[in-house]
Amino acid sequence: MAISKDDILEAVGNLTVLELNDLVKAFEEKFGVSAAAMAAPAAGGAAGGAAAEEQTEFTVVLADFGANKVGVIKAVREITGLGLKEAKDLVDAAPKPLKEGVSKADAEAAKKKLEEAGAKAEIK
């Protein structure tokens, strides 16, 4: 019996974020492709103007969970909204990006919460 596109979409729609991440990695390995977004071509005209722009989107990276793993898992759940298992898997896989494309204030708040729980976090 052949699997339809609708069946595949339904199955993918029921996956957790971590399961989707594993699926993407499996696709990358099996087919030798990258899931990275293609960069848009640079617009000509404003020479050097782009270099002076201030970064507006930041990524919070969990570098290390430190000695208080349980507290860090709780903080990760609070920041990301992940379930217990997904948050534990993310903490165990450190260093890992925790939140991507967030404002500077949100990134700093997440970093502060992680550090208060005993983790080492970075903003990139």
From Swiss-Prot:
GO molecular function, one term: mRNA binding
Family matches, as InterPro entries: Ribosomal_bL12, Ribosomal_bL12_C, Ribosomal_bL12_C/ClpS-like, Ribosomal_bL12_oligo, Ribosomal_bL12_oligo_N_sf
GO biological process, one term: translation
Keywords: Ribonucleoprotein, Ribosomal protein
Pfam families: Ribosomal_L12 (PF00542), Ribosomal_L12_N (PF16320)
Transmembrane segments: none
GO cellular component, one term: cytosolic large ribosomal subunit
Membership in a protein family: Belongs to the bacterial ribosomal protein bL12 family.
Subunit structure: Homodimer. Part of the ribosomal stalk of the 50S ribosomal subunit. Forms a multimeric L10(L12)X complex, where L10 forms an elongated spine to which 2 to 4 L12 dimers bind in a sequential fashion. Binds GTP-bound translation factors.
Function (record text): Forms part of the ribosomal stalk which helps the ribosome interact with GTP-bound translation factors. Is thus essential for accurate translation.
The name this protein goes by in its record: Large ribosomal subunit protein bL12
Source taxonomy: Bacteria, Pseudomonadati, Pseudomonadota, Betaproteobacteria, Burkholderiales
